[in-house]
């Protein structure tokens, strides 16, 4: 068979750069999107924030009619179209409606394309005082090491001992425990100093007198003893608590109260205040000072109740409203093929697509959020126990999109409700069959389990089998292993570890 050229007609799907951009913006979190918008504003002179438009409100900059066009990235308020003051890509002026000639009314973000962009953590740009800040964790602004070094500088000590102290402080972790053995710390010191192990131990004891109480301990028992030694000598049951912390901490951890009473030769009513004294201590003393970086969550959607109806709206403060800069757009001329004019036309087209991508993202987010609220009105009214089963397919079918699109739009997107701020994925859960043939959400079952355990007798905590039986009485058929899985997901210990003295 001879090789030959064959001409065929066919169709294939192509991932255009504009579609890639739309999908990338769709899956970004609000903080990442703010960073992306800022980069676009810095690199594209055709884009500007709507609040910056005041600089161009004079007739001299907008042309004789003084009209300006705003492309609002907020759904429901998109005013597109230039008047006589701007020019089209091909030259001349842009008549109203010409903005849509090269931009489809809907971006086809519904696609199975998965790997265009890998999101990464980004810093939040500088914000105004009134920007949303719902869930900021407060920070003391001081590390544990700096707090201990500050106390060290106030402590009279020889230069050699001070060097040992600094080495010890460097080996204390964020919980306040000494991570390295004293032999390792001794080996790290200069041999010419002639330091002995007992000198390192002596310096450690001085550091253990610093605040917070219990610092620089080598294990939990030593930390508790250090805290007990700083209590007033007349503290009730102090000596018994020291004995318990030193010799019987493992029995307390295993909730073996019978053996604990036998070993300490105490009655139940005597052991109870001893345990209460131990429980008043801090097992992680360093956490009082050490704090992690503040975590910020900016809600994308706000849900509120008005006249017995749940209303869904985008957080207007989360994403700035953008528009085409009419001043620069007015410089574009039809027949000018110069490099500068070509650059301006390309920047104008990129700005159009960027604004359209933001519009598409916001519209998709609104559609999905509205459907979630529609499905989970019971949760908003009554709490977790009223949560309904919901999977991605249910929302995808309701809004007419692919499940992969719903997955993107619900990842790292947050909804602010009267009950708190939740990631959109929180509202999705699997279902468990009920005795009546209905379905119950796994989230609702977790809430019921949590409620049952909170109301249990501390001396006789509910076992997983007993909880499964109580759920069955409510018409929810759940196996014991499923109860154990739900309990562990709630970070609740098994019944043997929940048992305590009354």
From Swiss-Prot:
GO terms for cellular component: DNA-directed RNA polymerase complex. Residues 68-77 have a biased composition (Polar residues). Residues 391-410 bind DNA. The keyword Transcription regulation applies. Keywords: DNA-binding, DNA-directed RNA polymerase, Nitrogen fixation, Nucleotidyltransferase, Sigma factor, Transcription, Transcription regulation, Transferase. One of its GO terms (molecular function) is sigma factor activity. Coiled coil: none annotated. InterPro entries: RNA_pol_sigma_54 (IPR000394), RNA_pol_sigma_54_core-bd (IPR007046), RNA_pol_sigma_54_DNA-bd (IPR007634), RpoN_core-bd_sf (IPR038709). GO terms for biological process: DNA-templated transcription initiation; nitrogen fixation. It comes from the Bacteria. Residues 40-104 are annotated as: Disordered. A motif (RPON box) lies at residues 479-487. The keyword Cell cycle does not apply. PANTHER family: RNA POLYMERASE SIGMA-54 FACTOR. Belongs to the sigma-54 factor family. NCBIfam families: PRK05932.1-2, PRK12469.1, rpoN_sigma. Sigma factors are initiation factors that promote the attachment of RNA polymerase to specific initiation sites and are then released. This sigma factor is responsible for the expression of the nitrogen fixation genes. The open complex (sigma-54 and core RNA polymerase) serves as the receptor for receipt of the melting signal from the remotely bound activator protein NifA for the expression of the nitrogen fixation proteins. This is RNA polymerase sigma-54 factor. The lineage of its organism: Bacteria, Pseudomonadati, Pseudomonadota, Gammaproteobacteria, Pseudomonadales.
């Amino acid at each position: 068979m001879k090789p030959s050229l064959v001409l065929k007609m066919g169709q294939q799907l192509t991932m255009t750069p504009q579609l890639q951009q739309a999908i990338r913006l769709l899956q970004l979190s609000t903080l990442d999107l703010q960073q992306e918008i800022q980069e676009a504003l810095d690199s594209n002179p055709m884009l500007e924030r709507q609040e910056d438009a005041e600089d161009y409100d004079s007739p001299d900059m907008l042309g004789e009619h003084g009209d300006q066009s705003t492309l609002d990235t907020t759904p429901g308020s998109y005013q597109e179209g230039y008047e006589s003051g701007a020019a089209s890509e091909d030259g001349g002026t842009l008549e109203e409606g010409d903005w849509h000639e090269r931009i489809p009314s809907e971006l086809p973000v519904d696609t199975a394309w998965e790997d265009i962009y890998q999101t990464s953590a980004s810093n939040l740009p500088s914000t105004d005082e009134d920007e949303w800040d719902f869930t900021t964790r407060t920070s003391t602004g001081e590390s544990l090491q700096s707090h201990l070094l500050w106390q060290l500088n106030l402590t009279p000590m020889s230069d050699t001992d001070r060097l040992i102290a600094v080495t010890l402080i460097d080996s204390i972790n964020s919980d306040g425990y000494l991570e390295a053995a004293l032999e390792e710390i001794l080996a790290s010191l200069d041999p010419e100093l002639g330091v002995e192990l007992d000198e390192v131990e002596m310096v450690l004891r001085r550091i253990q007198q610093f605040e917070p109480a219990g610092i620089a301990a080598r294990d939990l028992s030593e930390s508790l003893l250090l805290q007990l030694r700083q209590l007033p000598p007349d503290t009730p049951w102090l000596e018994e608590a020291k004995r318990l912390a030193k010799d019987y901490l493992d029995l307390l951890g295993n909730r073996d109260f019978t053996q604990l009473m036998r070993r300490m030769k105490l009655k139940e009513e005597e052991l109870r205040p001893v345990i209460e004294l131990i429980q008043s201590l801090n097992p992680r003393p360093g956490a009082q000072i050490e704090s992690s970086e503040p975590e910020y969550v900016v809600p994308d959607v706000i849900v509120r109740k008005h006249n017995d109806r749940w209303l869904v709206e985008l957080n207007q403060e989360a994403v700035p409203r953008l528009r085409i800069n009419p001043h620069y757009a007015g410089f574009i001329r039809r027949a000018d093929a110069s490099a500068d004019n070509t650059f301006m036309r390309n920047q104008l087209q990129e700005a159009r697509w960027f604004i359209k991508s933001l519009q598409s993202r916001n519209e998709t987010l609104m559609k999905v959020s509205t459907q979630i609220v529609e499905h989970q009105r019971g949760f908003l009214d009554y709490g977790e126990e009223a949560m309904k089963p919901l999977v991605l397919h249910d929302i995808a079918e309701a809004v007419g999109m692919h499940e992969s699109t719903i997955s993107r739009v619900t990842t790292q997107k947050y909804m602010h409700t009267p009950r708190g701020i939740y990631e959109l994925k929180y509202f999705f859960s699997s279902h468990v069959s009920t005795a009546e043939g209905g379905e119950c959400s796994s989230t609702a079952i977790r809430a019921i389990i949590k409620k049952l355990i909170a109301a249990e007798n501390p001396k006789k905590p509910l076992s997983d089998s007993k909880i499964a039986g109580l759920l069955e009485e409510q018409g929810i058929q759940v196996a014991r292993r499923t109860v154990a899985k739900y309990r562990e997901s709630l970070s609740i210990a098994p019944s043997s570890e929940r048992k305590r003295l009354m």
